Amino acid sequence: MALQKFPLLGLLFLITIVVSSTIAVDDPVCPTTSKLSRASFPNGFVFGTATAAFQVEGAINETCRGPALWDIFCKRNPERCSGHNADVAVDFFHRYKEDIQLMKNLNTDAFRLSIAWSRIFPHGRKEKGVSQAGVKFYHDLIDELLKNGIIPFVTVFHWDTPQDLEDEYGGFLSENIVKDFREYADYVFTEYGGKVKNWITFNEPWVFAHAGYDVGKKAPGRCSRYLKGCEDRDGRSGYEAYLVSHNLLNAHAEAVEVFRQKVKGGKIGIAHSPAWFEPHDLKDSNDVPTVSRVLDFMLGWHLDPTTFGDYPQIMKDLLGHRLPKFTSSQKAKLKDSTDFVGLNYYTSTFSNHNEKPDPSTPSWKQDSLVAWEPKNVDHSAIGSQPLTAALPVYAKGFRSLLKYIKDKYANPEIMIMENGYGDKLKDKDSVEVGTADYNRKYYLQRHLLAMNEAICIDKVRVTGYFVWSLLDNFEWQDGYNNRFGLYYVDFKNNLTRYEKESAKYYKDFLGQGVRPSALKKDEL
């Protein structure tokens, strides 16, 4: 048995003890159970899995689908898309009925999907044509989910701006996107709002703005040439990310205004993606405040406006004229413009005060006056990181982040829209190696326990949890070798799906207790 394949086996005994111990909490909404399972959570708690259109659908030349931002980015920069083949992806477009059966096999209650803008409006605007075949595909998908007792959660925008809008005016760099996004959101709410009641306007606005327009790692790959790896790029780091986010937030507010007119009894939010941070040096008076400062820049950047109507004060103070300003009417639309806080959590790191920022080379990370450190002052890593893990594993940070949101934002409803573990596998690795994902199983155990503690001990109002992802898929600039799925996809042999150990665990976890669909309305 190779340690490289199973680097966390040494922790198996400890983790088994932790997750199997009795959860004894004096709280009627948190039942006492002999081991951690669905039964350990409040009645009506929703468990599911998640994907995104560009990452799984494929079929880029079907339904009159127009080119999207990532299509062109990968075509122009193949080295940054690591084996990208969007026409195949994992072919969810043709195999969704098969994959819905995988969801049923897991005993899940819900499924988070996204609607590809360019599959509905191939050229970005209704007046330029609507693909009725694209519209029908999402109707068929949603109907199949409902037929199988699975609740659809739909993301309106998961990083797939129609390329025509990108070419016409720069996409989210222009305030023109606000009007076009409102039109698109209006259309999908009208079309699907009768049977879909749970919506997310934007997925991970921090990643979209920072990675796409500040460091250039993701589409459209814009950044200033003074940053490493950006020597041949166009862009303006330290400026464009804030402009993109400003337009995105105003687009969100406009979409929510339409949503509340069109979708009765529904809920809508944004899926945020902060890490958690621990101070690099607890004895350094400069390091401790870095945690709240970097979270204001990472989470508060988009959560403060949709809660309070404006950006965090620290961002205004440090950025000055580089941070756009909302009008009074925009603030009014943004305030309380979400019904829940969507949260994508994966990992944590250490935050170190940046003593000497260079004002001539602005960037988002430097602007927060925080350097991210993999180890603290004592040279200790945060959590654990198996040899094949994409990111450090730190479940304590998950609980800390949930409590932070409760305390700072007046205990809002929170839904975990993504939580998952990435394995960096090689092309030569076999299906047997890929499905023996014990590290992912342990990751899920530890994070489900941390979430249970946040709910039952810290009294955080978490109401749902989605594993990323149902299937191995295209992980943006990391391509296909970075696998997050509960089901292994054999990219060499007809994209065949195989159940992983983590899927078996999740199925067993969800097999104990009562599914929300089995409860009467007065019990929810």
Swiss-Prot record:
Gene name of this polypeptide: BGLU22
Keyword Metal-binding: no
InterPro entries in alphabetical order: Glyco_hydro_1, Glyco_hydro_1_N_CS, Glycoside_hydrolase_SF
Keyword Endoplasmic reticulum appears in the UniProt entry: yes
Catalytic residues as annotated in Swiss-Prot or TrEMBL: 204, 418
Its job: Beta-D-glucosidase active on scopolin >> esculin >> 4-MU-glucoside. No activity with DIMBOA-glucoside, pNP-glucoside, oNP-glucoside and sinigrin as substrates.
GO MF annotation: an example: beta-glucosidase activity
Localization, UniProt: Endoplasmic reticulum lumen
Motif Prevents secretion from ER boundaries: 521-524
Binding positions for a beta-D-glucoside per the UniProt entry: 55, 158, 203-204, 346, 418, 468, 475-476, 484
Tree of life domain: Eukaryota
Name of the molecule in the record: Beta-glucosidase 22
Predominant localisation class: endoplasmic reticulum
One GO-annotated biological process of the protein: carbohydrate metabolic process
Disulfide feature: 223-230
Entry-listed glycosylation sites: 61, 494
Record text on subunit structure and interactions: Component of the PYK10 complex, at least composed of PYK10/BGLU23, BGLU21, BGLU22, JAL22, JAL23, PBP1/JAL30, PBP2/JAL31, JAL32, JAL33, JAL34, JAL35, GLL22 and GLL23.
